Amino acid sequence: MVRRFRGESHHKVDTKGRVSIPASFRRVLESSDPNWTPGDAPELVIVYGDHRRNYLECYTMEAIEEVDKKIDALPRGSMERKMLQRLFHGQSYPTNVDETGRLVLPAKLRQKIDLEGEAFFIAAGDTFQVWKPETYEAEELAKTEEWLDELPEDFDPLVFLDGAKGE
């Protein structure tokens, strides 16, 4: 089963907030939605609540279920559980991909990340992110370049995976 999103792409956003999802991302959404059958629209959940994040985080149904199980395992009434419920349940938007492969992003979500005209999609493992292209370039691309610049020229970042759990 395909579980990982890979790649990045730019897509136009129309005035109603409709934006095409990369085709490869749609395949992952389909395979990670236990209720999906061919001809149906795959579901996903867009989490937008963290004010420190200038992007929308899009979860497959399987990925958000994993998050929900971890939240449910926390003690009832604990501050951590309350805050995580607020972020992942309350400040989230369940939706689906329409028959033409598009998402409809409500005005509230577009306003949160100042999105108009064009969206930048980037894979993040079992989620993907939607950014305003200029924000991504200014914030994330700069961080990655700075991080790489601090490493020796011949350094292979895969060395960080040596000794990773689950080998």
Regions of interest found by a model, annotated:
Residues 1-11, 15, 25-95, 99-100, ...:
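Flexible "stalk/tail and boundary" regions
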